[in-house]
């Protein structure tokens, strides 16, 4: 009987956990975002070959964030991280108009995967501090987000170096997690 109350208590007051996969083309800002969330500071990054994983505590939720390298040669490895992913953060360099079509192809390829069918999608339209950056509405259009059916998605304009928009994105993810449990 005590176990029942223990579970109930943990459900009401305990920490929730969410497994997040963060992907996007190379140089979109994934690693900068991860460490801005984790440490609150800008770190010097090099291209990620493989992955970085960190736990980010926010609003009584423990987000385990997997930041996976985005270079074209290693994108086929993304699928090895799909299992048990509850939330997908897709990071887009809003200033890279030449590769936004490539970003859309990679995103749509991933969203077609059965293992990600229940994952919610958060798009970070990153590098908003740059003068030529596409705004969130333009990125939404270029990625074809309005065509998504049967998937919860949200786009957030961000600047990884200042942190602008990052916690608003986590707010949306935490609300999605609460609504599903």
From Swiss-Prot:
Database matches in InterPro entries: Arf1-5-like (IPR045872), P-loop_NTPase (IPR027417), Small_GTP-bd (IPR005225), Small_GTPase_ARF (IPR024156), Small_GTPase_ARF/SAR (IPR006689)
Annotated coiled-coil segments of the chain: none
Lipidation (N-myristoyl glycine): 2
GO molecular function: GTP binding; GTPase activity
GO annotation terms (biological process): embryo development ending in birth or egg hatching; intracellular protein transport; mitochondrion organization; oocyte development; regulation of apoptotic process involved in development; regulation of receptor-mediated endocytosis; vesicle-mediated transport
Role noted for this protein: Small GTPase involved in protein trafficking between different compartments. Modulates vesicle budding and uncoating within the Golgi complex. In its GTP-bound form, triggers the recruitment of coatomer proteins to the Golgi membrane. The hydrolysis of ARF1-bound GTP, which is mediated by ARFGAPs proteins, is required for dissociation of coat proteins from Golgi membranes and vesicles. Involved in endoplasmic reticulum dynamics during embryogenesis. Also required for adult germline function.
Membrane topology category: Lipid-anchor
UniProt record similarity statement: Belongs to the small GTPase superfamily. Arf family.
Residues annotated as binding GTP: 24-32, 126-129, 160
Keyword flag Nucleotide-binding: yes
Activity regulation description: Alternates between an inactive GDP-bound form and an active GTP-bound form. Activated by a guanine nucleotide-exchange factor (GEF) and inactivated by GTPase-activating protein (GAP).
SMART domains assigned: ARF, RAB, SAR
Organism superkingdom: Eukaryota
Protein localization: Golgi apparatus membrane
Species of provenance: Caenorhabditis briggsae
Protein name: ADP-ribosylation factor 1-like 2
Region annotation Important for the stable binding to the membranes: where it falls in the sequence: 3-16
Keyword Hydrolase recorded: yes
UniProtKB keywords: ER-Golgi transport, Golgi apparatus, GTP-binding, Hydrolase, Lipoprotein, Membrane, Myristate, Nucleotide-binding, Protein transport, Transport
EC number: 3.6.5.2
Pfam families: Arf (PF00025)
Catalysis performed (reactions): GTP + H2O = GDP + phosphate + H(+)
Main localization of the protein described in the UniProt heading: Golgi
């Amino acid at each position: 009987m005590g176990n029942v109350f223990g579970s109930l208590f943990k459900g009401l007051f305990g920490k929730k956990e969410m497994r997040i996969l963060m992907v996007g083309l190379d140089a979109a800002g994934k690693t900068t975002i991860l460490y801005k969330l984790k440490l609150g500071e800008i770190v010097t990054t090099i291209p990620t070959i493989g992955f970085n994983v960190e736990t980010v505590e926010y609003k009584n939720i423990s987000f385990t964030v997997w930041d996976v390298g985005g270079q074209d040669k290693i994108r086929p490895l993304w699928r090895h991280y799909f299992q048990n992913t509850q939330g997908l953060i897709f990071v887009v360099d809003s200033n890279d108009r030449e590769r936004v079509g490539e970003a859309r192809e990679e995103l749509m390829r991933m969203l077609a995967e059965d293992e990600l069918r229940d994952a919610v999608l958060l798009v970070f339209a990153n590098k908003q501090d740059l003068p030529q950056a596409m705004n969130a509405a333009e990125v939404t259009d270029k990625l074809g987000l309005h065509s998504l059916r049967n998937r919860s998605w949200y786009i957030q304009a961000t600047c990884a170096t200042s942190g602008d928009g990052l916690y608003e994105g986590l707010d949306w993810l935490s609300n999605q997690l609460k609504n599903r449990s």
